[in-house]
Regions:
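Residue-level marker for buried hydrophobic side chains located in beta-strands
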Residues: 21, 56-58, 87-88, 152, ...
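Beta-strand-turn-beta hairpins that frame and shape the catalytic cleft
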Residues: 14-20, 145-152
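Active-site neighborhood of divalent metal-dependent phosphoester bond hydrolases
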Residues: 50-53, 65-145, 149, 160, ...
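Active-site environment of divalent metal-dependent phosphoester hydrolases
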Residues: 27-30, 64-67, 93-97, 160-161, ...
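Divalent-metal (often Zn2+) His-rich catalytic cores of metallo-beta-lactamase-fold enzymes
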Residues: 152-170
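N-terminal active-site segment of His-dependent metallophosphoesterases
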Residues: 1-73
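Divalent metal-coordination and catalytic microenvironments
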Residues: 24, 61, 90-91, 114, ...
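Acidic, His/Gly-rich catalytic cores of divalent-metal-dependent hydrolytic chemistry
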Residues: 2, 13-14, 172, 176-266
Length: 266
């Protein structure tokens, strides 16, 4: 592997550039495990590896909202530490990190569920988990550029002029997507459709905003199909742009309903 690291993004090259990029999990552990199995990964020594040398990448927002948040976090921590996986920062990942730092954050939008699971652990286990999460988070970045910058992975958004750069403004777009600076009645940022104007060279895979299906728009694709709302957990297999999905219908009882699609090629 060749790597050039610049502050909070990474440029990576591997002998074999084969990736399985997973959308927003949000605590849906059962669906994550089903998807990992369907992708052909095999468990060995506590980690999942692929017989063809494929690598897992998370677009972020692994926890919050679902019912098995710590299990999802633990899976990705192990995969990053020992399984050759990568995990770009999502806004929920960043919020949990700030919570662990001791910053004042609102226990809302699903974080309260993750914290409740943490609080149920014995103090020693809680502190060990905190340390493992923080070390893992600090080892990762806000966006990845892969395979000679052919492919980019980010959580919220990445404008063409930001590729290969980093700043506080770029950081905000990576976490939240492009916004107007205003907030809606629920306190969430009003979003702009940055993908509709994207004209960059890298193919950008992202999540954050729930989309009914993984539709390719201007060399971008949103693979958050709202599994935690009863939609789908999506994986994008690269190269080739093949989508594989697992349904999250059972989650409709706990969260607002959403819809998605089935396995597709794009």
């Amino acid at each position: 592997m060749k790597e050039r690291r610049e502050r909070n993004f990474r440029i990576l090259e591997f002998r074999e550039n084969k990736f399985d990029i997973i959308g927003d999990v949000h605590g849906c552990y059962d669906e994550l495990m089903e998807l990992i199995e369907r992708l052909g990964y095999e468990k060995k020594d506590g980690c999942y590896t692929h017989p063809e040398g494929r690598r897992l990448i998370s677009v972020g927002d692994v926890a919050d909202k679902g019912c098995q948040n710590l299990a999802c976090l633990d899976f990705w921590i192990e995969q990053v530490n020992n399984g050759g996986a990568f995990w770009v920062h999502g806004n929920h990942c960043n919020k949990l990190y700030r919570y662990f730092l001791g910053n004042r954050v609102h226990l809302s939008h699903g974080l309260e569920r993750t914290v409740a699971e943490l609080e149920a652990l014995p103090k020693e286990e809680r502190m060990v988990f905190r340390s493992r999460y923080m070390r893992c988070y600090e080892s990762q970045c806000f966006y990845l550029l892969l395979d000679r910058k052919r492919l980019a992975v980010v959580h919220g958004g990445l404008r063409p002029e930001s590729i290969g750069k980093f700043s506080n403004k770029i950081r905000a777009v990576c976490l939240y997507g492009e916004t107007t600076g205003n907030f809606d009645e629920n306190g969430k940022p009003e979003r702009l459709d940055w993908a509709a104007e994207y004209d960059g060279q890298p193919f950008v895979v992202y999540g954050h905003t729930v989309a009914e299906r993984p539709e390719i728009i201007n060399r971008t694709v949103d693979i958050d199909q709202g599994c935690v709302y009863g939609g789908y957990l999506t994986a994008l297999r690269d190269p080739g742009v093949v989508f594989l999905q697992v349904g999250g219908e059972k989650n409709r009882e706990n969260n607002a309903a959403g819809e998605g699609g089935e396995e597709r090629k794009g």
